[in-house]
């Protein structure tokens, strides 16, 4: 409770706060409650993608619902975490596969892309995050075609960025 009050005071006074607390002490709720009650834009940066997903999928909705505050929440990851329609299509037609797993994984990614709204590869647990096929079906800053891309309008990265711009709370990782 003391941590939540200190965080609320720091937010209200536009101040800074450095705080430390042990595992299982409720740090997440201690900062979420005052942040959501304060209104305005909030960016939460986590140290891991697992914690980022936990905040987005579980903790934030729980706190938002308990407080009954109408805040929108967006998840924003680096571009290598999203399937690229253009590179997926290229992999399907021109891909070089070193193993049968690559071919099997490509099929699963293709099906997933047809069903997902986000294109976030963490939503497809059937394909390991370190599977080599991901390098063929995601983009980098260097190989992204941007507005020249024939799949530009369906781009999962741009969709995630647009949702983040419109959201009250954005969950990122560093």
Model-identified regions with their sequence ranges:
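Short, surface-exposed connector motifs at secondary-structure boundaries
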Residues: 13-17, 38-43
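Active-site proximal loops enriched in glycine and acidic residues that flank catalytic Cys/His/Asp
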Residues: 21, 46, 174
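A substrate-engagement module of RecA-like helicase motors
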Residues: 41-42, 46-168
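Extended, Lys/Arg-enriched charged tracts that mediate electrostatic binding to polyanionic substrates
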Residues: 168-174
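Walker A/P-loop NTP-binding motif
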Residues: 8-9, 28-41, 58-62
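Conserved pre-motif I regulatory segment
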Residues: 1-19
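Walker A/P-loop
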Residues: 13-31
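Well-ordered alpha-helical segments embedded in enzymatic catalytic cores
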Residues: 2-6, 30-34, 156-159
């Amino acid at each position: 409770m003391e941590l939540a009050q200190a965080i609320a005071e720091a937010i209200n006074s536009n101040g800074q706060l450095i705080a430390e607390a042990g595992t299982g002490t409720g740090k997440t709720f201690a900062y979420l409650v005052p942040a959501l009650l304060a209104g305005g834009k909030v960016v939460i940066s986590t140290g891991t993608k697992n914690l980022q997903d936990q905040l987005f999928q579980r903790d934030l909705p729980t706190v938002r619902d308990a407080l009954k505050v109408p805040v929108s929440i967006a998840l924003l990851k680096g571009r290598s975490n999203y399937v690229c329609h253009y590179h997926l299509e290229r992999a399907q037609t021109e891909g070089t596969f070193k193993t049968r797993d690559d071919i099997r994984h490509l099929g699963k990614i293709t099906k997933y892309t047809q069903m997902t709204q986000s294109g976030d590869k963490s939503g497809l647990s059937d394909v390991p995050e370190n599977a080599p096929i991901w390098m063929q079906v995601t983009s980098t800053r260097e190989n992204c075609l941007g507005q020249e891309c024939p799949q530009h309008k369906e781009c999962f990265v741009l969709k995630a960025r647009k949702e983040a711009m419109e959201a009250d709370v954005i969950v990122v990782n560093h």
